[in-house]
């Protein structure tokens, strides 16, 4: 804005904001594939306001992917953007954008937009869950825990993220039917979840179950765990 109050807007940013459009402003966008992740994250943040990505920007992103630009992304940069995106209001739009840009098959080939994991992520966001719980909810229905380990290793996810995701993936089905378990089976579950040493992880585990099954109430399971700790 000039001294006289005149807006200097060579890229028509004000017009795009009013139209709720996310658009790249120069050819330099194509020089850094991290910008694909970043604009996907921005859509995850502003989608609820009605924002969308400009057609020409999406076309450029698709061209960048076709040219192999995302193949060279540094693992830590991918994780940084993923972790931030998980905490946005509509984290599923991060993945939807990457799918539209044809980058999902390269960056996250085992994550599907139409699987229960994505629904659990959406519910986790609605519940204002922490990022670590959202991550575990997203991956809960992965068919093989080795896939989760490979994903976490590939992008150097923090150990607490991978540990919770693996725990939820392996034990969520058993935990959801906990009231049907025998005392021995319940004890086996608690020992597997390491409730005596990993209470915070156990609490996150219960929160993840709330995202996976809308009718789940972790109070009973939490009380059982507390009673067991009292006895030991």
Question: How would you describe each model-predicted region?
Answer:
Residues 1-155:
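Glycine- and charge-enriched loop/helix tracts that form the active or gating conduit
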Residues 110-232:
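C-terminal subdomains that position terminal phosphate/3'-OH groups for nucleotidyl transfer/ligation
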